[in-house]
Amino acid sequence: MDDNKKKSLDLALKQIDKAFGKGTVLRLGDKEIEPIDSISSGSIGLDIALGIGGVPKGRIVEIYGPESSGKTTLTLHLIAESQKVGGVCAFVDAEHALDVKYAKNLGVDTDNLYISQPDFGEQALDIVETLARSGAVDLIVIDSVAALTPKSEIEGDMGDQHVGLQARLMSQALRKLTGVVHKMGTTVVFINQIRMKIGAMGYGTPETTTGGNALKFYASVRLDVRKIATLKQSDEPIGNRVKVKVVKNKVAPPFRQAEFDIMFGEGISKEGEIIDYGVKLDIIDKSGAWFSYDNSKLGQGRENSKAFLKENKAIADEITEKIRANMGDSIMSGAVDEEEMEGDE
Protein backbone atom coordinates (compact mmCIF):
# COMPACT_ATOMS: atom_id res chain seq x y z
CA MET A 1 0.00 0.00 0.00
CA ASP A 2 1.44 3.40 -0.95
CA ASP A 3 1.91 6.18 1.64
CA ASN A 4 -1.09 8.29 0.52
CA LYS A 5 -3.49 5.35 0.76
CA LYS A 6 -2.06 4.36 4.15
CA LYS A 7 -2.51 7.91 5.51
CA SER A 8 -6.09 8.02 4.21
CA LEU A 9 -6.87 4.63 5.76
CA ASP A 10 -5.28 5.60 9.11
CA LEU A 11 -7.35 8.80 9.16
CA ALA A 12 -10.53 6.87 8.39
CA LEU A 13 -9.78 4.32 11.14
CA LYS A 14 -9.17 7.11 13.68
CA GLN A 15 -12.51 8.71 12.76
CA ILE A 16 -14.28 5.35 13.15
CA ASP A 17 -12.59 4.69 16.54
CA LYS A 18 -13.59 8.18 17.73
CA ALA A 19 -17.19 7.76 16.61
CA PHE A 20 -17.83 4.14 17.59
CA GLY A 21 -15.06 3.18 20.04
CA LYS A 22 -11.59 1.68 19.80
CA GLY A 23 -11.41 -1.68 18.05
CA THR A 24 -14.51 -1.20 15.89
CA VAL A 25 -12.41 -2.09 12.82
CA LEU A 26 -9.52 -4.52 13.27
CA ARG A 27 -7.01 -6.04 10.88
CA LEU A 28 -7.20 -9.82 11.25
CA GLY A 29 -3.42 -10.15 11.28
CA ASP A 30 -3.13 -7.85 14.32
CA LYS A 31 -5.01 -10.19 16.63
CA GLU A 32 -4.88 -13.94 17.13
CA ILE A 33 -8.17 -15.57 16.18
CA GLU A 34 -9.57 -17.20 19.31
CA PRO A 35 -11.31 -20.60 19.15
CA ILE A 36 -15.10 -20.50 19.39
CA ASP A 37 -16.40 -21.39 22.85
CA SER A 38 -19.24 -23.88 23.06
CA ILE A 39 -21.89 -25.35 25.34
CA SER A 40 -22.06 -29.15 25.44
CA SER A 41 -25.27 -30.71 24.13
CA GLY A 42 -25.15 -33.51 26.69
CA SER A 43 -24.52 -36.02 23.88
CA ILE A 44 -20.98 -37.22 23.10
CA GLY A 45 -21.84 -37.93 19.46
CA LEU A 46 -23.65 -34.64 18.86
CA ASP A 47 -20.84 -32.61 20.46
CA ILE A 48 -18.39 -34.17 18.01
CA ALA A 49 -20.80 -33.83 15.07
CA LEU A 50 -21.07 -30.09 15.82
CA GLY A 51 -17.31 -29.84 15.35
CA ILE A 52 -16.49 -27.55 18.29
CA GLY A 53 -17.69 -29.65 21.23
CA GLY A 54 -21.25 -28.32 21.39
CA VAL A 55 -23.38 -25.39 20.24
CA PRO A 56 -21.42 -22.14 19.74
CA LYS A 57 -21.57 -19.32 22.28
CA GLY A 58 -22.70 -15.92 21.06
CA ARG A 59 -24.74 -17.38 18.19
CA ILE A 60 -28.33 -18.13 17.25
CA VAL A 61 -29.26 -21.83 17.04
CA GLU A 62 -32.41 -23.48 15.67
CA ILE A 63 -33.51 -26.95 16.79
CA TYR A 64 -36.45 -28.26 14.79
CA GLY A 65 -38.32 -31.48 14.11
CA PRO A 66 -41.70 -33.24 14.43
CA GLU A 67 -43.60 -33.35 17.72
CA SER A 68 -42.20 -35.61 20.46
CA SER A 69 -38.87 -36.02 18.66
CA GLY A 70 -36.70 -34.80 21.56
CA LYS A 71 -36.26 -31.08 20.81
CA THR A 72 -37.11 -29.79 24.30
CA THR A 73 -35.14 -32.62 25.91
CA LEU A 74 -32.06 -31.54 23.94
CA THR A 75 -32.44 -27.91 25.05
CA LEU A 76 -32.87 -28.95 28.70
CA HIS A 77 -29.60 -30.89 28.44
CA LEU A 78 -27.96 -27.75 27.02
CA ILE A 79 -29.20 -25.80 30.05
CA ALA A 80 -27.96 -28.49 32.47
CA GLU A 81 -24.50 -28.59 30.84
CA SER A 82 -24.25 -24.78 30.87
CA GLN A 83 -25.23 -24.63 34.55
CA LYS A 84 -22.59 -27.27 35.42
CA VAL A 85 -19.86 -24.81 34.40
CA GLY A 86 -21.48 -21.83 36.14
CA GLY A 87 -23.64 -20.57 33.28
CA VAL A 88 -26.78 -18.48 33.85
CA CYS A 89 -29.73 -19.77 31.80
CA ALA A 90 -33.23 -18.58 30.94
CA PHE A 91 -36.18 -20.46 29.46
CA VAL A 92 -38.82 -18.45 27.59
CA ASP A 93 -41.80 -20.79 27.74
CA ALA A 94 -44.11 -19.39 25.07
CA GLU A 95 -45.96 -22.74 24.94
CA HIS A 96 -46.58 -22.64 28.73
CA ALA A 97 -45.67 -26.33 28.84
CA LEU A 98 -42.35 -26.70 30.70
CA ASP A 99 -42.27 -29.86 32.85
CA VAL A 100 -40.19 -28.77 35.84
CA LYS A 101 -39.96 -32.29 37.31
CA TYR A 102 -38.61 -33.66 34.00
CA ALA A 103 -36.12 -30.78 33.79
CA LYS A 104 -34.83 -31.71 37.27
CA ASN A 105 -34.45 -35.35 36.22
CA LEU A 106 -32.23 -34.21 33.34
CA GLY A 107 -29.92 -32.35 35.71
CA VAL A 108 -31.30 -28.82 35.37
CA ASP A 109 -30.88 -26.68 38.49
CA THR A 110 -34.46 -25.40 38.38
CA ASP A 111 -33.96 -23.23 41.47
CA ASN A 112 -31.51 -21.09 39.49
CA LEU A 113 -33.24 -21.28 36.10
CA TYR A 114 -34.93 -18.06 35.00
CA ILE A 115 -38.29 -18.68 33.35
CA SER A 116 -40.76 -16.43 31.56
CA GLN A 117 -44.19 -17.29 30.18
CA PRO A 118 -44.98 -14.33 27.90
CA ASP A 119 -48.46 -13.43 26.69
CA PHE A 120 -47.52 -12.70 23.06
CA GLY A 121 -44.62 -12.86 20.62
CA GLU A 122 -43.40 -9.26 20.86
CA GLN A 123 -43.16 -9.54 24.66
CA ALA A 124 -41.20 -12.81 24.41
CA LEU A 125 -38.66 -11.41 21.95
CA ASP A 126 -38.26 -8.17 23.93
CA ILE A 127 -37.50 -10.27 27.03
CA VAL A 128 -34.90 -12.26 25.07
CA GLU A 129 -33.24 -9.06 23.78
CA THR A 130 -33.16 -7.45 27.25
CA LEU A 131 -31.65 -10.56 28.85
CA ALA A 132 -29.04 -10.83 26.08
CA ARG A 133 -28.11 -7.13 26.34
CA SER A 134 -27.44 -7.56 30.07
CA GLY A 135 -24.39 -9.66 29.21
CA ALA A 136 -25.10 -11.77 32.30
CA VAL A 137 -27.04 -14.62 30.68
CA ASP A 138 -25.14 -17.41 28.91
CA LEU A 139 -28.02 -19.34 27.34
CA ILE A 140 -31.60 -18.43 26.43
CA VAL A 141 -34.04 -21.05 25.11
CA ILE A 142 -37.29 -20.07 23.35
CA ASP A 143 -39.96 -22.79 23.22
CA SER A 144 -41.22 -22.41 20.56
CA VAL A 145 -41.26 -20.23 17.44
CA ALA A 146 -44.76 -21.48 16.56
CA ALA A 147 -46.05 -20.13 19.90
CA LEU A 148 -44.67 -16.60 19.33
CA THR A 149 -48.06 -15.25 18.34
CA PRO A 150 -48.15 -11.54 17.40
CA LYS A 151 -50.16 -9.32 19.77
CA SER A 152 -52.51 -8.17 17.00
CA GLU A 153 -53.46 -11.78 16.28
CA ILE A 154 -54.19 -12.53 19.94
CA GLU A 155 -56.30 -9.39 20.33
CA GLY A 156 -58.09 -9.89 17.00
CA ASP A 157 -61.23 -11.88 16.34
CA MET A 158 -61.33 -15.55 15.39
CA GLY A 159 -61.17 -15.90 11.62
CA ASP A 160 -59.25 -12.65 11.03
CA GLN A 161 -56.49 -12.92 8.45
CA HIS A 162 -52.96 -12.30 9.76
CA VAL A 163 -50.84 -13.38 6.82
CA GLY A 164 -47.08 -12.99 7.32
CA LEU A 165 -47.29 -11.22 10.71
CA GLN A 166 -45.21 -13.81 12.56
CA ALA A 167 -42.60 -13.94 9.79
CA ARG A 168 -42.21 -10.13 9.92
CA LEU A 169 -41.98 -10.24 13.72
CA MET A 170 -39.20 -12.87 13.58
CA SER A 171 -37.32 -11.03 10.84
CA GLN A 172 -37.32 -7.75 12.78
CA ALA A 173 -36.33 -9.41 16.07
CA LEU A 174 -33.49 -11.44 14.57
CA ARG A 175 -31.98 -8.41 12.84
CA LYS A 176 -31.63 -6.82 16.30
CA LEU A 177 -30.68 -9.98 18.19
CA THR A 178 -27.84 -11.24 16.00
CA GLY A 179 -25.42 -8.42 16.82
CA VAL A 180 -26.40 -8.32 20.49
CA VAL A 181 -25.85 -12.03 21.19
CA HIS A 182 -22.51 -12.02 19.36
CA LYS A 183 -21.25 -9.01 21.31
CA MET A 184 -22.45 -10.32 24.67
CA GLY A 185 -21.56 -13.99 24.12
CA THR A 186 -25.11 -15.20 24.74
CA THR A 187 -26.37 -18.31 22.96
CA VAL A 188 -30.01 -18.09 21.89
CA VAL A 189 -31.72 -21.38 20.99
CA PHE A 190 -35.05 -21.38 19.16
CA ILE A 191 -37.12 -24.57 19.22
CA ASN A 192 -39.18 -24.85 16.04
CA GLN A 193 -41.84 -27.14 14.64
CA ILE A 194 -42.38 -28.61 11.20
CA ARG A 195 -45.32 -27.87 8.93
CA MET A 196 -46.28 -29.20 5.52
CA LYS A 197 -45.97 -26.74 2.65
CA ILE A 198 -49.37 -25.90 1.18
CA GLY A 199 -49.63 -27.18 -2.38
CA ALA A 200 -46.08 -28.58 -2.41
CA MET A 201 -45.55 -30.88 -5.38
CA GLY A 202 -42.64 -32.41 -7.28
CA TYR A 203 -39.02 -31.72 -6.35
CA GLY A 204 -38.00 -30.80 -2.81
CA THR A 205 -39.20 -31.67 0.65
CA PRO A 206 -42.85 -30.85 1.45
CA GLU A 207 -41.79 -29.87 4.98
CA THR A 208 -40.98 -26.40 6.22
CA THR A 209 -40.41 -24.71 9.59
CA THR A 210 -42.68 -22.04 11.07
CA GLY A 211 -41.91 -18.32 11.38
CA GLY A 212 -40.72 -17.57 7.85
CA ASN A 213 -37.19 -17.75 6.43
CA ALA A 214 -35.39 -15.27 8.73
CA LEU A 215 -34.39 -17.87 11.33
CA LYS A 216 -32.95 -20.16 8.63
CA PHE A 217 -30.75 -17.28 7.51
CA TYR A 218 -29.64 -15.87 10.88
CA ALA A 219 -29.04 -19.20 12.66
CA SER A 220 -25.38 -20.25 12.80
CA VAL A 221 -26.41 -23.84 13.55
CA ARG A 222 -29.59 -25.71 12.57
CA LEU A 223 -30.32 -29.14 14.01
CA ASP A 224 -32.94 -31.50 12.57
CA VAL A 225 -34.15 -33.88 15.30
CA ARG A 226 -36.02 -37.06 14.31
CA LYS A 227 -37.27 -40.10 16.21
CA ILE A 228 -36.17 -43.21 14.28
CA ALA A 229 -37.24 -46.04 16.62
CA THR A 230 -39.02 -46.85 19.87
CA LEU A 231 -36.89 -48.61 22.49
CA LYS A 232 -38.65 -51.44 24.30
CA GLN A 233 -37.95 -53.73 27.22
CA SER A 234 -40.25 -56.74 27.55
CA ASP A 235 -42.58 -55.10 25.00
CA GLU A 236 -42.83 -51.99 27.19
CA PRO A 237 -41.67 -48.70 25.57
CA ILE A 238 -38.80 -47.25 27.62
CA GLY A 239 -37.49 -44.55 25.27
CA ASN A 240 -36.80 -43.40 21.73
CA ARG A 241 -33.85 -43.72 19.39
CA VAL A 242 -33.17 -40.26 17.94
CA LYS A 243 -31.12 -39.04 14.97
CA VAL A 244 -29.88 -35.43 14.87
CA LYS A 245 -28.59 -33.97 11.59
CA VAL A 246 -26.50 -30.80 11.57
CA VAL A 247 -28.12 -29.34 8.44
CA LYS A 248 -26.40 -25.96 8.79
CA ASN A 249 -23.17 -25.07 10.56
CA LYS A 250 -21.27 -21.79 10.15
CA VAL A 251 -18.58 -22.66 12.68
CA ALA A 252 -17.55 -26.16 11.52
CA PRO A 253 -18.22 -28.57 8.61
CA PRO A 254 -21.98 -29.21 8.32
CA PHE A 255 -24.04 -32.29 7.36
CA ARG A 256 -22.74 -34.54 10.12
CA GLN A 257 -25.15 -36.54 12.23
CA ALA A 258 -25.42 -38.37 15.53
CA GLU A 259 -27.74 -41.01 16.97
CA PHE A 260 -28.53 -41.55 20.63
CA ASP A 261 -31.19 -42.88 23.02
CA ILE A 262 -33.61 -40.65 24.89
CA MET A 263 -35.02 -42.59 27.83
CA PHE A 264 -38.45 -41.64 29.16
CA GLY A 265 -38.10 -39.60 32.35
CA GLU A 266 -34.28 -39.59 32.15
CA GLY A 267 -33.28 -37.85 28.91
CA ILE A 268 -30.22 -38.64 26.77
CA SER A 269 -28.60 -41.95 27.69
CA LYS A 270 -24.89 -41.15 27.90
CA GLU A 271 -24.18 -44.76 28.83
CA GLY A 272 -25.90 -45.93 25.63
CA GLU A 273 -23.67 -43.62 23.59
CA ILE A 274 -20.56 -44.87 25.40
CA ILE A 275 -21.44 -48.45 24.43
CA ASP A 276 -22.38 -47.60 20.81
CA TYR A 277 -19.31 -45.51 20.01
CA GLY A 278 -17.05 -47.65 22.19
CA VAL A 279 -17.91 -50.72 20.10
CA LYS A 280 -17.48 -48.81 16.82
CA LEU A 281 -14.03 -47.65 17.86
CA ASP A 282 -13.01 -51.07 19.28
CA ILE A 283 -12.63 -49.54 22.74
CA ILE A 284 -15.37 -51.86 24.03
CA ASP A 285 -15.36 -55.51 22.97
CA LYS A 286 -18.63 -57.19 22.00
CA SER A 287 -18.77 -60.97 22.00
CA GLY A 288 -22.25 -62.33 21.42
CA ALA A 289 -24.48 -60.52 23.91
CA TRP A 290 -21.59 -59.67 26.26
CA PHE A 291 -19.82 -56.31 26.40
CA SER A 292 -16.39 -55.95 27.99
CA TYR A 293 -13.78 -53.26 28.51
CA ASP A 294 -10.10 -53.74 29.35
CA ASN A 295 -10.69 -57.50 29.90
CA SER A 296 -13.49 -56.77 32.40
CA LYS A 297 -17.10 -57.63 31.60
CA LEU A 298 -19.58 -54.73 31.59
CA GLY A 299 -22.66 -56.90 31.31
CA GLN A 300 -24.78 -59.21 29.20
CA GLY A 301 -26.95 -57.20 26.84
CA ARG A 302 -26.97 -53.48 26.15
CA GLU A 303 -29.32 -52.48 28.98
CA ASN A 304 -27.33 -54.39 31.63
CA SER A 305 -24.09 -52.84 30.35
CA LYS A 306 -25.68 -49.37 30.51
CA ALA A 307 -26.71 -50.04 34.12
CA PHE A 308 -23.12 -51.08 34.97
CA LEU A 309 -21.67 -47.89 33.47
CA LYS A 310 -24.24 -45.77 35.32
CA GLU A 311 -23.10 -47.32 38.62
CA ASN A 312 -19.38 -47.12 37.76
CA LYS A 313 -18.86 -43.50 36.75
CA ALA A 314 -15.04 -43.67 36.79
CA ILE A 315 -15.02 -46.40 34.12
CA ALA A 316 -17.66 -44.53 32.08
CA ASP A 317 -15.58 -41.33 32.21
CA GLU A 318 -12.43 -43.22 31.19
CA ILE A 319 -14.14 -44.74 28.14
CA THR A 320 -15.69 -41.37 27.26
CA GLU A 321 -12.27 -39.70 27.17
CA LYS A 322 -10.96 -42.42 24.85
CA ILE A 323 -13.99 -42.01 22.57
CA ARG A 324 -13.52 -38.23 22.34
CA ALA A 325 -9.81 -38.68 21.63
CA ASN A 326 -10.34 -41.28 18.90
CA MET A 327 -13.62 -40.22 17.31
CA GLY A 328 -13.12 -39.59 13.60
CA ASP A 329 -15.10 -38.08 10.77
CA SER A 330 -15.79 -41.56 9.39
CA ILE A 331 -18.22 -42.27 12.23
CA MET A 332 -19.85 -38.85 12.44
CA SER A 333 -20.12 -37.79 8.82
CA GLY A 334 -23.45 -38.33 7.12
CA ALA A 335 -24.55 -36.65 3.93
CA VAL A 336 -27.85 -34.82 4.04
CA ASP A 337 -30.07 -35.05 0.99
CA GLU A 338 -30.01 -31.99 -1.25
CA GLU A 339 -33.73 -31.48 -0.77
CA GLU A 340 -33.19 -31.26 3.00
CA MET A 341 -30.60 -28.53 2.43
CA GLU A 342 -33.11 -26.41 0.54
CA GLY A 343 -33.36 -22.90 1.96
CA ASP A 344 -30.04 -23.07 3.86
CA GLU A 345 -27.93 -21.43 1.20
From Swiss-Prot:
- Entry's transmembrane regions: none
Per the entry, what this protein does is: Can catalyze the hydrolysis of ATP in the presence of single-stranded DNA, the ATP-dependent uptake of single-stranded DNA by duplex DNA, and the ATP-dependent hybridization of homologous single-stranded DNAs. It interacts with LexA causing its activation and leading to its autocatalytic cleavage.
Cellular-component GO terms for this entry = cytosol
Q: Which CDD domains match?
A: RecA
The record's subcellular locations are: Cytoplasm
Family that this chain belongs to: Belongs to the RecA family.
One term of GO molecular function: ATP-dependent DNA damage sensor activity
Q: What species is given as this protein's source?
A: Campylobacter fetus subsp. fetus (strain 82-40)
Where the protein is mainly located, per its record?
cytoplasm
Q: Which InterPro entries match?
A: AAA+_ATPase, DNA_recomb/repair_RecA, DNA_recomb/repair_RecA_CS, P-loop_NTPase, RecA-like_C, RecA-like_N, RecA_ATP-bd, RecA_C_sf
Keywords for this protein: ATP-binding, Cytoplasm, DNA damage, DNA recombination, DNA repair, DNA-binding, Nucleotide-binding, SOS response
The protein in question is named Protein RecA
Keyword match DNA-binding = yes
Lipid metabolism: is it a keyword of this entry? Answer: no
